[in-house]
Swiss-Prot record:
Belongs to the glycosyltransferase 1 family. Bacterial/plant glycogen synthase subfamily. Coiled coil: none annotated. It catalyses: [(1->4)-alpha-D-glucosyl](n) + ADP-alpha-D-glucose = [(1->4)-alpha-D-glucosyl](n+1) + ADP + H(+). This is Glycogen synthase. It comes from Pectobacterium carotovorum subsp. carotovorum (strain PC1). InterPro entries: Glyco_trans_1, GS/SS, Starch_synth_cat_dom.
Length: 479
């Protein structure tokens, strides 16, 4: 079966969020499972630079300008790049300028991505034509609309990585997209008078997936649906909405051979983790003490991630004897709040503003607890890294967090299921009660080590997701 992924980022060449991790790992896992998989993306500078031996497949004139379709390989996966320098040859973020203003022509840049995804299904490359076109997030949402307009030459799947980003554009651009005029309506891609590339994917795809089963249900509810819940509820009732968990790339995230860790360890050599903790405490200016639990936050610093309540819970956490390390950037008030906490609680709180992939490995390899108190979380990768590294996740019961972390309740401990700490309400009180439970387990080192081993035994490898997507593709292809 031939599968084409349509997306805008690819780890490690270009990443602004978790979408890149999926695009960088899922196709390879699918190829290993026996599928014929390729990826198509805009030819952003970092992608053109990072993919060697690019060959010209086709040159063509389109509604968005002259296109050169390039093809090469990266990590064993075939990659198509849509080369239109006037649209994509811009340094920095693929979505906005250095002043953080979205590019005014984004409507055209990502319409072309969708159109090219559709054209691939219509035979643009004479030597390779997909049976399934798998589009990701709003950037690729129009792919499904173009396929519908062309009488569906391939089956389409649209994966929502985060429903909050909707790809909204002024209705006056509709004629520029070369789609049927009747597509601009409520039963189409119109959303409160605007064009929504996200809604185009949701409405016209043969099947919608999200990145966890719980999030797939949550987005059918007003609290999480961002105005799309009615459409999503109907897709759920039609059996056309499902959740498949993201995976962890075990070539990159594995404490047994992570080159970024000072000391390697596994389930059977957990004592070796202590050296990583000592180095982390030293690097973050904390008192070196293996008797106190280190709580880590590695995240965008936003209220969506629940970090306002995490900040408020710090005094109580420190009073019980813990330490806190923070790595991330985001909202100015949260950045200032965490920096103020580091200044006030010198030696107990360490904060680094910014994001460094290498340092995130050292934090997760050295900390005892990873905090992910999100208000909503489509899947979440940080807690999966924590599980893999025996750094117990402390999470709110939402989205992928609910699907991947089992609370250290007495029942779960007895049944061998416990892997972390889960709280329900997005409040300081609820988080603080969960923190107290962390300290109770911490006071029993043998039990703590038992839960660490449980967590590290869980399998969230990409091969699991690859098999789930393969079964979905097969079901769509044969119906």
């Amino acid at each position: 079966m031939r599968v084409l992924h349509v997306c805008s980022e690819l780890f490690p060449l270009l990443k602004t969020g978790g979408l890149a991790d999926v695009a960088g790992a899922l196709p390879g896992a699918q190829i290993a499972a026996g599928m014929d998989v390729r990826v198509i993306l805009p030819a952003f500078p970092d992608l053109k630079k990072g993919i060697a031996n690019l060959q010209v497949v086709r040159e063509l004139d389109t509604f968005a300008g002259h296109v050169t379709l390039l093809f090469g390989h990266f990590n064993g996966v075939g990659i198509y790049l849509i080369d239109v320098p006037e649209l994509y040859e811009r340094a920095g973020s693929p979505y906005h300028d250095p002043a953080l203003y979205a590019y005014a022509d984004n409507y055209l840049r990502f319409a072309l991505l969708g159109w090219m995804g559709c054209e691939m299904a219509c035979g643009l490359d004479h030597y390779w034509r997909p049976d399934i076109v798998h589009a990701h997030d709003w950037h690729a949402g129009l792919t499904c609309a173009y396929l519908a307009a062309r009488n569906r030459p391939a089956k389409s799947i649209f994966t929502v990585h985060n429903l909050a980003y909707q790809g909204l554009f002024d209705a006056r651009h509709m004629p520029d997209l070369h789609l049927p005029r009747e597509f601009f309506q409520v039963y189409g891609l119109e959303f409160y008078g605007q064009i929504s590339y996200l809604k185009a994917g949701l409405y016209y795809a043969d099947h919608i997936t999200t990145v966890s089963p719980t999030y797939a249900h949550e987005i059918t509810l007003p609290a999480y649906g961002y105005g799309m819940e009615g459409l999503l509820k109907s897709r759920e009732e039609e059996g056309r909405l499902s959740g498949i968990l993201n995976g962890v790339d075990e070539m990159i995230w594995n404490p047994a051979h992570d080159p970024l860790l000072a000391s390697h360890y596994s389930r059977d050599t957990l004592a070796n983790k202590a050296e990583n903790k000592r180095r982390l405490q030293t690097a973050m200016g904390l008192k070196v003490d293996d008797k106190v639990p280190v709580f880590a936050i590695v995240s965008r610093l936003t209220s969506q991630k629940g970090l306002d309540i995490a900040l408020s819970a710090i005094p109580d956490l420190l009073e019980q004897g813990g330490q806190v390390v923070v790595l991330g950037a985001g909202d100015a008030d949260l950045q200032e709040g965490f920096l103020a906490a580091a200044a006030e609680y010198h030696g107990q709180v360490g904060v680094q503003i910014g994001y460094h992939e290498a340092f995130s490995h050292r934090i997760i390899g050295g900390a005892d607890v990873i905090m992910v108190p999100s208000r909503f979380e489509p899947c979440g990768l940080t807690q999966l890294y924590g599980l893999k590294y025996g750094t117990l996740p402390l999470v709110r019961r939402t989205g992928g967090l609910a699907d991947t972390v089992s609370d250290c309740s007495l029942e779960n401990l007895a049944d061998g299921l416990a892997s972390g700490f889960v709280f329900n309400d997005c409040s300081v009180g609820s988080l603080s009660r969960a923190i107290r439970r962390v300290f109770v387990l911490w006071s029993r080192p043998t039990l703590w080590r038992y839960v660490q081993r449980q967590a590290m035994a869980m399998d969230f490898g990409w091969q699991v997701a690859a098999q789930a997507y393969g079964a979905l593709y097969q079901r769509l292809y044969t119906h």
